[in-house]
Amino acid sequence: MSFSPPPTEVFDVIVVGGGHAGCEAAITAARLGLSTALFTLNLDRIAWQPCNPAVGGPAKSQLVHEVDALGGVIGRLADATAIQKRVLNASRGPAVWALRAQTDKRHYSREMLQLLHHTPNLALREAMVTGLEVDGDPEPAGQARITGVRTYFGSVYGAQAVVLTAGTFLGGRIWVGHQSMSAGRAGEQAAEGLTDALKQLGFQTDRLKTGTPARVDRRSIALDQLEAQPSDAADRFFSFDPTAWASGEQMSCHITRTTAATHQLIKDNLHLTAIYGGIIDSKGPRYCPSIEDKIVRFADKDSHQIFLEPEGRDTPEIYVQGFSTGLPETIQLELLRTLPGLEQCVMLRPAYSVDYDYLPATQLKPSLETKRVRGLFSAGQLNGTTGYEEAAAQGLVAGLNAARLIGGQEPVHFPRENSYIGTMIDDLVSQDLREPYRVLTSRSEYRLVLRGDNADRRLTPLGRELGLIDDRRWQLFNDKLQAMEEEKQRLETVRLKVSDPVASTVEKESGAPIRGSITLADLLRRSGVHSSDLVRHRLADAELPLAVREGAEIDIKYSGYLQRQQQQIDQVKRQSLRKLPADLDYASIGTLSREAREKLTAIQPTTLGQATHIPGVSQADLTALLLWLELQKRRSQKSESLASSTNSR
């Protein structure tokens, strides 16, 4: 190893990168009593939201609830800075309910910076980390140990553990059309040297791509001609801590759509993008495609929905969600003006793509420590994920396990059956993912169990055991548990009699008669009856917290689900050797996710067991495939039986 100068400073933990993963990692390690330093290229862009200024959404909100249940901060800050909140998938079952908050991005960043400044044991440093200090030979893997980092200007900082959370900054290059420049994101330099340092230690790196749409001036949009989308969930929050709740002035988003002119302009100029022009071939996020990808992949669609989302209360900037593009700047304004309501719009910032180096996460342990270098951890977009929520969850896990490594404690592994955090990490470290990973409810075979509302019941006891939950939060949690148990007991014992004044109204609304009497629990088990209906009919206490009422309702409605789900999982395990027909048309199986249909069609596994190892094919997909095979088997047996009966006549 090369000789290094004496360290300028020494810390227990160094976190490299000040995004959502880095902030959670640094705060977690510091709260566990470790002297921690967060290194970032720009202290004025802490926890910045360079793409969509929003937190939550399907599966992502569950992650945010889980991080909060473990003492993390993303949920608290989203609650404090929300300017619009909505519940997605509200008409479906609780497994896929999702809270989504439009946040004030500048306010969010300021709040995070203040939180970092006031966290004991945590120091902030603005510097570019370009190298890793290591003791021992990296070959064979696992023999080397991290001892610190080296910065661009030659300073060395010592540490027993280092967490890399560099986001899109490693070798980052932004593209607008065929023109490009070195940058981690618009206006900020890329990180130099760290990719080479990782390669010298024997790590494999690859390239991924993402992008962000243009920002337009709100004052130049005819919002009065567009459909408004106001907040509908001002009373719902990510955090389980009421002291974090805030209900400031809400702002509406607006909806427009692409037109035939939009599609034609894109088709005519596809060759001018870096991807379709063949200049770069990095994989972009499957579930957040550019508008060019939408037009190409969904050629049969005449129009695509576009959301106009405010970036904050004190800025006129509007984020054009669903309209990221790699087209040249000279075409982007013309393209924007094909959208209804934007005919006279002013473009404040052009859209761009960014491709960057990442560290395939199969090189990590489930603790997010690297397999090659002891004490070196990696989290966030560097691991190939996409999204602030995925990054925050990984940051918490990496910071936690870095602290435990230094303390001589066993790492914490999150099982996939107990959290979306565990599902995500299991997918990352066990599958050879070659495109940006986004958490989805369909990736979890346990999704009704892994709801947002019960994240505290699943994880807060663990957080308390690990030292991440203080006495006040622990008391809040236990008070909620007690209130829920009391409410469930009340619902199971209190009966509504047919002679009660509200009985006839309840019968009419539920569509079923009350024979003599019925417990409130059995009433809740009826389709379409909810705890809010009990409150409306004065059969439940309106002062009872919403989380308590809804939690009790869900527990009662879905009490038998766990057993049925476990039976399905066990059946999948037993069926791992089951042969798959060579001519199986996966594209025709509608219950499979789109990704699973594509991957299964391409690979054509011969057994169900082989299908379990295909990246992008989740346990939920395997269950759906197994059920489909069983259905086909029964249909075949029935046809054979009918044919046999006919022939015997």
From Swiss-Prot:
Its cofactor is FAD. NAD(+) binds at residues 284-298. Signal peptide: none annotated. Keywords: Cytoplasm, FAD, Flavoprotein, NAD, tRNA processing. Pfam families: GIDA, GIDA_C_1st, SAM_GIDA_C. It is found in: Cytoplasm. InterPro entries: FAD/NAD-bd_sf, GIDA_C_N, MnmG, MnmG-rel, MnmG-rel_CS, MnmG_C, MnmG_C_subdom, MnmG_C_subdom_sf. One of its GO terms (cellular component) is cytoplasm. Its main location: cytoplasm. SUPFAM superfamilies: FAD/NAD(P)-binding domain. Gene3D superfamilies: FAD/NAD(P)-binding domain, GidA associated domain, C-terminal subdomain, tRNA uridine 5-carboxymethylaminomethyl modification enzyme MnmG/GidA. FAD binds at G17, G18, G19, H20, A21, G22. It comes from the Bacteria. NAD-binding protein involved in the addition of a carboxymethylaminomethyl (cmnm) group at the wobble position (U34) of certain tRNAs, forming tRNA-cmnm(5)s(2)U34. Belongs to the MnmG family. Homodimer. Heterotetramer of two MnmE and two MnmG subunits. This is tRNA uridine 5-carboxymethylaminomethyl modification enzyme MnmG. It comes from Synechococcus sp. (strain CC9311). The gene is mnmG.
